[in-house]
Amino acid sequence: MTRIKICGITTLEDALAAVEAGAHALGFNFSTTSPRAVTPQTARSIISAIPPFITTTGIFVEQSPDEINSICERCNLHCAQLHSEAYDAQSSLAVSAPSIIRVFRAGPSFHMDQVRSYAGKTGIRNFLFDAFREGQPGGTGESIEDTTAIRIFKETASIGSAILAGGLKPENVGRAIRLVSPYAVDTASGVESVPGRKDHDKIRAFVRAVQEADNDSSSPEA
C-alpha cells in the first residue's frame, strides 16, 4: 500500500478533509519563505484536533537543529522533514524528532552516492526525492524526469524508504506509482485551489488515484 502525505496544511478544515479522504500523513511547513508557512502555534492547534494514527510531519528549510527540536516538541510532531543541503550528517544527528526524512532534489545528474553516504553516517533511512530547481528547496510543482526517477527508486530499495514528490496531482500520481513503486507519495500544490489552501475535491481525487494504482499493482494480471 502506497502511503499518502498531504503537505502544506494551514487550516484544520483542510487537515480533516485530508484525513477523511484517506491520507496517512500531514505536512506542516515552517519555512518562513513558503506560501504555505504556518506558525508553531497554528500547527499545534490543528494537530491537537486531528484523529489519532495520523503521522504529523514538520517541514524545515532554514531552522537550526535546536529550533527544529523545539518546534517538534511544542507541536507534538512525529517526524522532521529536512530540506536543503545545510542539513548534513552532523546537523541531522542533532535533530531529536522521533523520525527524520531527508529530502534530496533530483536532477538528471543526481548521484546516489550522496544518499548512501548520508545513510551510512546517520543511520537515517527515510528519503524524499523532489524535482531539482536552482535556488528552491522544493514545492516547485515540477516532476522528476522519468529515467532519473526509475534509477533513483530502484537503487534506494536497498537503502531505505523512498518517498516521491514533485508535481504530483490526481491526473499523474497513478502513473508515477506504476513507474517507480514508491513507499509513499507527497503532494502540496497538486491538491490546492490557491497556495496554502486545499481543494478538497482534488484531495479526494488524489487519494482515489493512489488507491486505484495500488489495486492495479496487486491484481493477478499486474
From Swiss-Prot:
What reaction(s) does this enzyme catalyze?
N-(5-phospho-beta-D-ribosyl)anthranilate = 1-(2-carboxyphenylamino)-1-deoxy-D-ribulose 5-phosphate
Task: Give EC number(s), comma-separated.
Answer: 5.3.1.24
GO MF terms on file?
A: phosphoribosylanthranilate isomerase activity
- Annotated pathway: Amino-acid biosynthesis; L-tryptophan biosynthesis; L-tryptophan from chorismate: step 3/5
- InterPro entries according to UniProt: Aldolase_TIM, PRAI_dom, RibuloseP-bd_barrel, TrpF_fam
The UniProt keywords, alphabetically, are:
Amino-acid biosynthesis, Aromatic amino acid biosynthesis, Isomerase, Tryptophan biosynthesis
Gene3D superfamilies attached here? Aldolase class I
Name of this chain's protein: N-(5'-phosphoribosyl)anthranilate isomerase
Record the organism: Prosthecochloris aestuarii (strain DSM 271 / SK 413)
